[in-house]
Amino acid sequence: MRPGEGAGIAPVSADPNVSDPTTIAARGPARRRLPGPTLAQVFDTRVNALNVWRLVLASGVILQHSWPLTGRKVHPPYDQLFTQVWVDGFFAISGFLIAASWVRNPRLREYVAARALRILPGLWVCLVVIAFVIAPIGVAIQGGSAAKLLMSRAPIEYVLHNAVLHVFYAGIDGTPRHVPFPGVWDGVLWTLIFEIFCYIAIAVAGVAGLLKRRWPAVVVFILLVVFSALVAYPVEVQTVFQMIGRFALVFAAGTLLHQFQDKIPARWSLVALSAVIVLAAGLLMPNYRVLAAIPLAYAVVVSGALIHHERLRLRTDLSYGVYIYAWPMQQLLAICGLSFLPPVVFAVVAVVVTLPLAALSWFLVEKRALSLKSRIKSRARGWGAVVSGGSRISTPGS
C-alpha cells in the first residue's frame, strides 16, 4: 500500500449458518439473545467507507511528514502514534482485502497480475514525473540549471533504480538541496517493499491451502506478536527486523479479521473501544502494535464496513496517488520557501497541491491499468477452457 488495494472484490456473503431469530425463539427456553451482526454480514464491497478511510490515512501521512519536511520533530509521548498509525492502518485494511481477494479468486497468475497492476504503473509514472518534471522545477527555482540536470544520467538512473524498488537511490544528483530533509525526493517508497512482501506471503499461504482454514492465521499472528515484541528495542533506532515486525503484524491482523469475519461482531461500541486501546497503547507502550494491532485493524475495517452511506462510497481511489505524490510535492513546497509555515498549515497546502496529481494518476494511469485485470482474467480462463476442452476431446471414450 499500499498504500491503495481492494477494488473489484466481490461482496462477502453473510454467514449461511446464522439462523433466523424467529427460528431461534421457537426452540424453547434455552434460546440466547443474538450478539448482533457479524463483520461478514455488514461488509459490502460495493457500499463501504474503506476508500474514504484510505484517503484519510493518506492525508494523515501528509500531516505526519509535515514535521520533518519543515525541520521540526514530534516529541514523546505522541510520536509513535502520530508517525506510525497512518501507514499501519493502510496495512491493516490491505491485509483484510488482499486475503479476501485470494479467497474469492485463488488463481496465482491472476492474483499476481492484479497486485502488479495496482502498484507498478502508478509508481512508474510517478517516478518519471518526479525525475523529469518536479526535480527540474525544484532545481530551477533554486537558481540551478534544469537543462543540465535533464541532460545528465541522474533522472534516468533514479527512475530505473526505484522502478524495481531499489529505494536507497533516493535523490537525483544530490537534489533536493537546501531543504530541511535533503537528498530524498519520495520518502514513502520504501514501505511499498513491505507491502509487496505481504502480497507474496498471502500468495504462498493461498497456494499452500492455508487460507482455507482459520488456525494458520492465528498461529502466524501470535508468532508475529512475539517477534515484534522481541525486536522492539532499541526504540530510537529502527532496524530492518523492527520494520518487518511492524508491517507484517498489522497486515496479519487485517488478515485475521478476514478469516474470522463470520464470527466477529460488528458494533460501533467495539470500534470506539478499539480506538481507545490503540490510543492508550500508543501513549504507554514502546511498541503499541503488540497490544493494539487487532484493535487498530478492527477500528478501521469494521467502521468502514458499518458505514453504508452512498455519499461516503468513493468510486475513485485517490489514496495511492496521494500517498506517492505528497512527499515530492511537500519537498517542492519547501524549496519554494514554505517550510516556515506551521506543520498543520503546511500539510493543508500540501493536500491542496497533491490532490490534482492524485486525480490525474487515478484517471489516466491507475484506473486504466486496473481495467486490464478483466482482460487478463478472461484470457486466462479462455485458455483454460480451450485446454480443458481439448483434453476431453482427446480422451478415449469421451
Residue ranges and their predicted role:
Residues 196-224, 258-269:
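Solvent-exposed interhelical
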Residues 276-367:
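Alpha-helical transmembrane segments of multi-pass integral membrane proteins
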Residues 47-50, 75-87, 181-194, 232-250, ...:
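Interfacial loop-to-helix transition and helix-capping segments at the boundaries
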Residues 2, 14-15, 20-41, 133, ...:
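C-terminal "closing" transmembrane helix and its immediate cytosolic amphipathic cap
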Residues 84, 124-196, 297-299:
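Membrane-interface helix-loop-helix regions
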Residues 46-103, 120-123, 322-327:
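Functionally critical transmembrane alpha-helices in membrane proteins and complexes, commonly lining
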